[in-house]
Amino acid sequence: MLTRFITDVSTRFNPFSAKAKAARLFLSFLPPNARSNGMNITTQLLPRNSTETPLLYVKFKDGKEMNLDVENMGIKSIVEEVDRHSRILQKQADLNDG
């Protein structure tokens, strides 16, 4: 997963819920040095009996914001969506550099 162009990641989920699996996996895909490279990562853990829906919010360097439905999307779909926009930004960066 291309994380170079991601500036903000916010998650809210119940760690005991099966519906939050995609949000947990997405956080595990982020590199260990993401915070030191300028990415703002915010995680809010909900109590076990919470009925709030899980949330995954991603913001890119170009200002695009994505609110992803982690309850109904699998991790592959989420990574696809994020990578799709990251590849567009990568192409633009390559064109500007080249």
Curated annotation (Swiss-Prot):
**Pfam families, from UniProt?**
MRP_L53
Query: Which controlled-vocabulary keywords does the entry list?
Result: Mitochondrion, Ribonucleoprotein, Ribosomal protein
Which domain of life does this protein belong to?
A: Eukaryota
Where is the chain membrane-spanning? none
Q: Name one GO molecular function term.
A: structural constituent of ribosome
Tell me a GO cellular component. Answer: mitochondrial large ribosomal subunit
Tell me where in or outside the cell this protein is found.
Answer: Mitochondrion
By its UniProt entry, which InterPro entries does this protein fall under?
A: Ribosomal_mL53, Ribosomal_mL53_fung
| Biological role stated in the UniProt entry | Component of the mitochondrial ribosome (mitoribosome), a dedicated translation machinery responsible for the synthesis of mitochondrial genome-encoded proteins, including at least some of the essential transmembrane subunits of the mitochondrial respiratory chain. The mitoribosomes are attached to the mitochondrial inner membrane and translation products are cotranslationally integrated into the membrane.
Quaternary structure and partners: Component of the mitochondrial large ribosomal subunit (mt-LSU). Mature N.crassa 74S mitochondrial ribosomes consist of a small (37S) and a large (54S) subunit. The 37S small subunit contains a 16S ribosomal RNA (16S mt-rRNA) and 32 different proteins. The 54S large subunit contains a 23S rRNA (23S mt-rRNA) and 42 different proteins.
Q: Which family does it belong to?
A: Belongs to the mitochondrion-specific ribosomal protein mL53 family.
Q: What is this protein called?
A: Large ribosomal subunit protein mL53
